């Protein structure tokens, strides 16, 4: 309604300027004109606030503890829970990768019906020794909430800027990517109890710790702390894997 009234006033004023319309001062809605000043002022304030939310362009790699999924007791396919353990630890929750492995939801690699497990429901297959695939954001988010409650946010489906914003706030981010942090061409189609999904055995999970204009830094549960990887390739791989991300606020 305010927008409509604003347009009407602008049309009237335009008529005054271009067609010489005569308007008596008593016919002008002075309070409304004053309200227009407030709208403009509020708009300027909002713009200033939004500009403060813009990315700085970099975030120095955080000192997040590194856990190796291959350390005993080994989790051959346990990159997701190992990365979650790093993020939880940074937020102040003392938990091991193997504890999380025992707590995360699981589903079979292959059902008796021939259907495949859905990583959106739980870890698919055998995490410790294989064969297995992995687990996606939803079960990880649910598991993280049992520790950190409302401090956990699922950023899945948002733009990469949402991840970088969290890094600038000092929060490492759990993500799904690929093993070499570049898009892959070996995607497979699986029929699951929930329908058809696209998967790859090249799926991998890491804890993102920082970024700049060229690189993304991450704790790789294969044993690399603040590993530097090409930002453009990483973003493409992350998007290919469904833009999955979970963060725990400090």
Swiss-Prot record:
Q: Which InterPro entries match?
A: Peptidase_C39-like, Peptidase_C39_single_dom, UCP032442
Q: Does the keyword Signal apply?
A: yes
The protein here is known as Uncharacterized protein YvpB
A single Pfam family it belongs to is: Peptidase_C39_2
Signal peptide per UniProt: 1-25
Q: Which species is this UniProt entry from?
A: Bacillus subtilis (strain 168)
Q: Which domain of life is it from?
A: Bacteria
Residue ranges annotated as coiled coil are none
């Amino acid at each position: 309604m305010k927008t409509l009234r604003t347009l009407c006033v602008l049309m009237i004023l335009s008529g005054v300027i271009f067609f010489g319309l005569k308007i008596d001062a008593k016919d002008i809605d002075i309070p409304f004109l004053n309200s227009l000043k407030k709208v403009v002022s509020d708009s300027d304030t909002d713009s200033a606030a939004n500009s403060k939310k813009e990315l700085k362009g970099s975030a120095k790699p955080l000192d997040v503890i590194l856990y190796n999924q291959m350390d005993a007791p080994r989790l051959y396919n346990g990159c997701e829970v190992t990365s979650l353990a790093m993020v939880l630890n940074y937020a102040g929750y003392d938990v091991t990768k193997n504890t999380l492995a025992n707590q995360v939801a699981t589903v079979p690699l292959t059902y008796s019906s021939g259907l495949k497990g859905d990583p959106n429901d739980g870890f698919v297959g055998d995490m410790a020794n294989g064969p297995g695939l992995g687990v996606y954001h939803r079960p990880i988010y649910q598991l993280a909430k049992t520790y950190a409650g409302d401090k956990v946010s699922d950023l899945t489906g948002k733009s990469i800027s949402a991840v970088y914003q969290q890094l600038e706030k000092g929060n490492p981010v759990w993500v799904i990517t690929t093993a070499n942090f570049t898009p892959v061409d070996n995607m497979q189609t699986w029929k699951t109890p929930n329908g058809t999904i696209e998967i790859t055995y090249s799926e991998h999970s890491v804890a993102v710790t920082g970024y700049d204009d060229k690189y993304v830094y991450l704790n790789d549960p294969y044993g690399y702390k603040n590993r530097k990887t090409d930002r453009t390739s990483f973003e493409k791989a992350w998007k290919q894997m469904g833009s999955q991300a979970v963060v725990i606020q400090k």
